[in-house]
Regions:
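Short, flexible catalytic-loop segment of classical short-chain dehydrogenase/reductase
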Residues: 4, 38, 42-53
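Short C-terminal tail/terminal secondary-structure segment
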Residues: 4-5, 82, 93-105
Length: 105
């Protein structure tokens, strides 16, 4: 969501998300004629060592904002990447795939 709507404080984070969106679409258009697809993933809160180090008072409110009711697992992100790299996605290019439990961070 921040990469689409921005946020009022701290412009660096949404700026990098906007950059990934723009770069993905621009490269996809630039390379389409060569048969090269360009896509990206936008992972939400994912169960990692970094997240495990956060206190419960930080994690619980984050999970409460995720409509699917849980944080992602690394395998969730990997599955999206494998799909985008597969022949099943051969007609998909210029997409930033949110893998975020509908949180749209």
């Amino acid at each position: 969501r921040v990469g689409r709507d921005g946020q009022p404080a701290g412009c660096a984070y949404p700026t990098t998300k906007f950059a990934v969106n723009g770069l993905t679409l621009s490269l996809a258009r630039e390379l389409a004629g060569k048969g090269i697809r360009v896509n990206a993933v936008a992972p939400g809160v994912t169960h990692t060592d970094m997240v495990d180090a956060l206190p419960d008072e930080v994690i619980k409110p984050l999970i409460a904002t995720i409509p699917l009711g849980r944080m992602g697992e690394p395998e969730d992100i990997a599955n999206g990447v494998v799909f985008l790299a597969s022949d099943m996605a051969s007609y998909i290019s210029g997409v930033v795939l949110p893998i975020d439990g509908l949180a749209r961070t």
